[in-house]
Amino acid sequence: MPYKVKDISLAPQGEKKIRWVQEHMPVLERIKSDFSEEKPFKGVTIGSCLHLEPKTINLGLTLQAGGAEVAMTGCNPLSTQDDATAAGAKMGLNMYGWRGETNEEYYENIHRVLDHEPEILIDDGADMIFLVHRERPELLDGIIGACEETTTGINRLRAMAADGALKFPVMAVNDAYTKYLFDNRYGTGQSTFDSIMGTTNMLIAGKTVVVCGYGWCGRGIAMRAEGLGASVIVTEVDPIRALEARMDGFRVMKVSDAVKEADILITATGNTDVVSESEFMNMKDGCVMANSGHFNVEINREALEELSRETGKVKEDIEVFIMPDGRKIYLLAEGRLVNLASERGQGHPAEIMDMSFAMQALSARHLLQEKPDPGVYRAPDEIDLMVARMKLDAMGIEIDELTEKQRLYLENWEEGT
């Protein structure tokens, strides 16, 4: 199998990591077993643009077990784990990617995956989907559809569909209950602080943590910050989410006011310039900033650099920016996705990604079976419920079922008081 990775000799180390996550991804392992018998992807090429680490390699192996030829590249220049890509290549996957890619290399690797002429795409952030529309239109007729993992990617694709520019169907895997209620909330909450604490060795208890954005990712971050003993401030542009954050017990204020108190500031909005010039001018001395959104646009690093009288690297993944008045502001992982782009970041726990990648695998099979028209589609409820039931089963949990009388009662509109 063709591959382009940093060091193929790292494969044994990566294989150990993959075997470990497989033991903690029982739903995906069950699907892998089913796929190995059914071969739903026999003769199909699947191209993915995902964070290349042990859990995503396991997804690739699941698709491979289903008969697919799989080509994989990374969706972030800093999130690739080189031992995992080496192991994936040794296991028969077409791997393209390494940690520390330049922007040019990043897009070259996406093109390398597209050179395999995939019929199904699995994307995280929609860069591959956009690239095939803009630069490889000759491939569009051969693409059955795609699955998108993130809120950011789905927002971009819905805008594309609204303009009539989307040429094939996309399954919004992010909109599945078994994805966003767990991956976005519990996964992001835990992995964000795993990475921040591992990178900085800071104590969270007693700190003021500002969380920009109160979607499902922001909720998870705020919840974990509070659990670690921090005082939490939430910033929002949506009045309903802001009200919800206040009712959940957090202080709510404008970003411009919150930065004056922030010991740690974390962005999770999916939008651009959330923290920029005016915020940097008023930011508390010693504030540590991190981004948990998909793209590195939420914290305006360029503006921060221009405002600074001096910049430097404190240690791996920690930059310092010294302002004209002597204040120091710290930025983790270049403002990229901190839970994966940081050297210490391992991404979400395997038990969480078990559900998200189960949804990816089953949604890809659904695309192949149904071949819907171009557009953005929510994954069918039956797939969502199937994944939830398999996860409960793997956890040894049994739940009740409605009796026939209860079912009829819920369906009957005539009964009242």
UniProtKB/Swiss-Prot annotation:
Compartment(s): Cytoplasm
Q: Which CDD domains match?
A: SAHH
A Pfam family hit: AdoHcyase
Q: Which UniProt keywords apply?
A: Cytoplasm, Hydrolase, NAD, One-carbon metabolism
- Miscellaneous: SAH is a product of SAM methyltransferases and is known to be a feedback inhibitor of these enzymes. As a result of this inhibition, organisms have evolved efficient enzymes to metabolize SAH via different pathways. The pathway found in methanogens differs from the canonical pathway, it uses the deamination of S-adenosyl-L-homocysteine to form S-inosyl-L-homocysteine for the regeneration of SAM from S-adenosyl-L-homocysteine.
Q: Which pathway does the record list?
A: Amino-acid biosynthesis; S-adenosyl-L-methionine biosynthesis
The UniProt note on the cofactor reads as follows:
Binds 1 NAD(+) per subunit.
Domain of life from the UniProt record: Archaea
For this protein, the record's HAMAP family field holds:
AdoHcyase
Required co-factor(s) are: NAD(+)
GO molecular function, a single term:
trialkylsulfonium hydrolase activity
What is the name of the protein in this document? Answer: S-inosyl-L-homocysteine hydrolase
In the UniProt record, the signal sequence range is none
Name the residues that bind NAD(+).
150-152, 184, 213-218, 236, 271, 292-294, 339
> GO:BP terms for this protein?
one-carbon metabolic process; S-adenosylmethionine biosynthetic process; S-adenosylmethionine cycle
Which EC number(s) are documented for this chain?
3.13.1.9
